[in-house]
Amino acid sequence: MLAFNFFGATEGGLFDINATLPLMAIQVVALTYILNSLFFKPVGNVVEKREKFVSNNVIEAKNKLSEVKKLEADLLTQLQSARTEAQRIVSEAEDESDKLYKEALELANNEANASKEKARLEIESQTSAARDQLSKQADVLSELIVNRLILEK
């Protein structure tokens, strides 16, 4: 007993081995079981449900993001093809417009040349007719002049 007094331990201390120690152990086990069944399991279930919910939402968000990226790529492809098609249509329209302009210009030139040629031929015809008429009138006048000169003599 002298050895125990030397370290300052007395009877009835913290680590006395008697019936209190097993009773405390049983209380700790019972408290652990009660806390586990009443508090930790429901909280754990709620945490697991929340983790599953978050995990499912993350997976769903990743899937939707993947789908959005795919749709964006498809739309960009469609936009590029639409732009190419629009450029092709504009180019064709410009070519058609140029072609129609050239055809209209050529037609107008041909009509102008035809009108000019027709007017030239008409002028030549009228000039020729006027010369013929003048020639006939000159013949008639010269005959008259000759007749008068002959008669006056």
Swiss-Prot record:
Question: Where is this chain's protein located in or outside the cell?
Answer: Cellular thylakoid membrane
This protein's species is: Prochlorococcus marinus (strain MIT 9301)
| Keyword Nucleotide-binding part of the UniProt annotation | no
Q: Does the keyword Repeat apply?
A: no
What gene name is given for the protein in this entry?
A: atpF2
Q: Chief subcellular site? A: membrane
Family of this protein: Belongs to the ATPase B chain family.
Protein name per its UniProtKB record: ATP synthase subunit b'
Primary role: F(1)F(0) ATP synthase produces ATP from ADP in the presence of a proton or sodium gradient. F-type ATPases consist of two structural domains, F(1) containing the extramembraneous catalytic core and F(0) containing the membrane proton channel, linked together by a central stalk and a peripheral stalk. During catalysis, ATP synthesis in the catalytic domain of F(1) is coupled via a rotary mechanism of the central stalk subunits to proton translocation. Component of the F(0) channel, it forms part of the peripheral stalk, linking F(1) to F(0). The b'-subunit is a diverged and duplicated form of b found in plants and photosynthetic bacteria.
What is the protein's quaternary organization?
F-type ATPases have 2 components, F(1) - the catalytic core - and F(0) - the membrane proton channel. F(1) has five subunits: alpha(3), beta(3), gamma(1), delta(1), epsilon(1). F(0) has four main subunits: a(1), b(1), b'(1) and c(10-14). The alpha and beta chains form an alternating ring which encloses part of the gamma chain. F(1) is attached to F(0) by a central stalk formed by the gamma and epsilon chains, while a peripheral stalk is formed by the delta, b and b' chains.
